[in-house]
Curated annotation (Swiss-Prot):
Mechanisms controlling activity: Inhibited by the diuretic drug amiloride. External calcium is required to potentiate proton activation of ASIC1 at physiological concentrations, but at higher, non-physiological concentrations, it inhibits activation. Also potentiated by other multivalent cations like Mg(2+), Ba(2+). Activated by FMRFamide-related neuropeptides. Inhibited by anti-inflammatory drugs like salicylic acid. The spider venom psalmotoxin-1 specifically inhibits the ASIC1 homotrimer. The snake venom mambalgin-1, mambalgin-2 and mambalgin-3 inhibit the homotrimer of Asic1a (ASIC1 isoform 1).
Protein name: Acid-sensing ion channel 1
Effect of residue 316 to A: No change in the shift of pH for both activation and desensitization by the spider venom psalmotoxin-1
Entry's Gene Ontology cellular component terms: cell surface; dendrite; glutamatergic synapse; Golgi apparatus; membrane; plasma membrane; postsynaptic density membrane; presynapse
InterPro entries: ENaC, ENaC_chordates, ENaC_CS
Phenotype for residue 173 to S: No significant decrease in inhibition by the spider pi-theraphotoxin-Hm3a
Gene name as annotated: Asic1
PROSITE patterns registered for this protein in UniProt: ASC
Major location (coarse): membrane
Length: 526
């Protein structure tokens, strides 16, 4: 018998030759390069073609990997029909912040300069520009002789002197059913005291609509009360040159930001606002720039751009003026009229118009907005002017200058989804690489595993030949001893070669009386 060599025992089975591996490999062209033939032009051409294909493959794969790490995205647009839609919140503000009749002597004393009704000497600045009736009332209120001022609070002033929805609202219908001022919730914005219809707050359910078109939404008739507008004798942030209302249509999940996002509605017109709900889905970094985390704010629970802006503006004013405006959340003290004039209004104007770095709000990953199309017609017509004047006990001129109708509805009962999607995902990358591997070198993932497996066997064998595995093998042999199988022993044929062994190696007859006289080793194996 030929015993195994020490090298075979230590190093294991020697791996097959490169020619044998190439002939059985699934990698195309490898068998022609590593063949048993002598070096020839054919083998050289095969090697050249293989290396060229491999180079092209590496270039294409590199380009695909670079494209993947550019994180491109595409935008998918779809329209989805719905059986019903949640009607949006509608916030409206009169462009005049304070009613002239509600400004008291104490209000005029504290806020007269802020409203440009008085100068810094508590005097009416330009009596020639004033209406005679208003001037008479104002002169009486501006007489501060023996007047003892009382404490003044801007929040209370805005709430008391702002326009009342119960006086403004002449008619209200939602889906053909009557609604009232009780369906409007008071909300403060930079325009002062405003009102939100269908706010979804205070335990009230969000209203839904079942059809599109006029008559299936909100229709209101308002009196803007121009007779109550403050006289304008100067330019301040609290005075308005316009007449009408400002309207914002928004989701119930975000606060109104009407001074930046609202649209105007003029008296003397019926304005039709056709809406379409749009649901926007943006991708977070690195494919997009949306904010996927919840808002870290003490004032708002859910993140939105308007909530972020209001939160940022509030913090900015508190840091710079040590107070907050009436429409801002929090527990900081309200600004006084002097702080409004000297600090709050200039600081907020600077922040909104010029500072592009302080209040930078990222787009939320999920957003609902409402696309709008506006159209309008003149009211009242000549045929209806007298009727409306009689109905509301006003003159025809008053009706034309103060009455407006606002009609908000869904154009159709569907919503539009605008969704960002990854243009190239990891599955696409692997598919492209796999396809190019199959095209250029005829390889697959299993082919790559074949190459790694063969390389592992070759490296392992060579390391063991250099003695790096022998120490472990010798240590193992010293611990365990040499283990021979029964077949290995029999192949030495001890029964024939050791029959004439000296008697000193035989068993004693009294131990094995019926056994032939053989040596211990022969007896065991035979």
């Amino acid at each position: 018998m030929e015993l195994k060599t020490e090298e075979e025992e230590v190093g294991g089975v020697q791996p097959v030759s490169i020619q044998a591996f190439a002939s059985s490999s699934t990698l195309h062209g490898l068998a022609h390069i590593f063949s048993y033939e002598r070096l020839s032009l054919k083998r050289a051409l095969w090697a050249l073609c293989f290396l060229g294909s491999l180079a092209v493959l590496l270039c294409v794969c590199t380009e695909r990997v670079q494209y993947y790490f550019c994180y491109h995205h595409v935008t998918k647009l779809d329209e989805v029909a719905a059986s019903q839609l949640t009607f949006p919140a509608v916030t409206l503000c009169n462009l005049n912040e304070f009613r002239f009749s509600q400004v008291s002597k104490n209000d005029l004393y504290h806020a007269g300069e802020l409203l440009a009704l008085l100068n810094n000497r508590y005097e009416i600045p330009d009596t020639q520009m004033a209406d005679e009736k208003q001037l008479e009332i104002l002169q009486d209120k501006a007489n501060f002789r023996s007047f003892k001022p009382k404490p003044f609070n801007m929040r209370e002033f805005y709430d008391r002197a702002g326009h009342d929805i119960r006086d403004m609202l002449l008619s209200c219908h939602f889906r053909g059913e009557a609604c009232s001022a009780e369906d409007f919730k008071v909300v403060f914005t930079r325009y002062g005291k405003c009102y939100t219809f269908n706010s979804g707050q205070d335990g009230r359910p969000r209203l839904k609509t079942m059809k599109g078109g006029t008559g299936n939404g909100l229709e209101i008739m308002l009196d803007i009360q121009q007779d109550e507008y403050l006289p304008v004798w100067g330019e301040t942030d609290e005075t308005s040159f316009e007449a009408g209302i400002k309207v914002q249509i928004h989701s119930q999940d975000e606060p109104p930001f009407i001074d930046q996002l609202g649209f105007g509605v003029a008296p003397g017109f019926q304005t039709f606002v056709s809406c379409q709900e749009q649901r926007l889905i943006y991708l977070p970094s690195p494919w997009g720039t949306c904010n996927a985390v919840t808002m870290d704010s003490d004032f708002f629970d859910s993140y939105s751009i308007t909530a972020c802006r209001i939160d940022c503006e509030t913090r900015y004013l508190v840091e710079n003026c040590n107070c907050r405006m009436v429409h801002m959340p929090g527990d900081a003290p309200y600004c006084t009229p002097e702080q409004y004039k000297e600090c709050a209004d200039p600081a907020l104007d600077f922040l909104v118009e010029k500072d592009q770095e302080y209040c930078v709000c990222e787009m939320p990953c999920n957003l609902t907005r409402y696309g709008k199309e506006l159209s309008m017609v003149k009211i009242p017509s000549k045929a209806s002017a007298k009727y409306l004047a009689k109905k509301f006990n006003k003159s025809e001129q008053y009706i034309g200058e103060n009455i407006l109708v606002l009609d908000i509805f869904f154009e159709v009962l569907n919503y539009e989804t605008i969704e960002q999607k990854k243009a190239y995902e990891i599955a696409g990358l692997l598919g492209d690489i796999g396809g190019q591997m199959g095209l250029f070198i005829g390889a697959s993932i299993l082919t790559v595993l074949e190459l790694f497996d063969y390389a592992y066997e070759v490296i392992k064998h060579r390391l063991c030949r250099r003695g790096k595995c022998q120490k472990e093998a010798k240590r193992s042999s010293a611990d365990k001893g040499v283990a021979l199988s029964l077949d290995d022993v029999k192949r030495h044929n001890p029964c024939e070669s050791l029959r004439g062994h000296p008697a000193g190696m035989t068993y004693a007859a009294n131990i094995l009386p019926h056994h032939p006289a053989r040596g211990t080793f022969e007896d065991f194996t035979c």
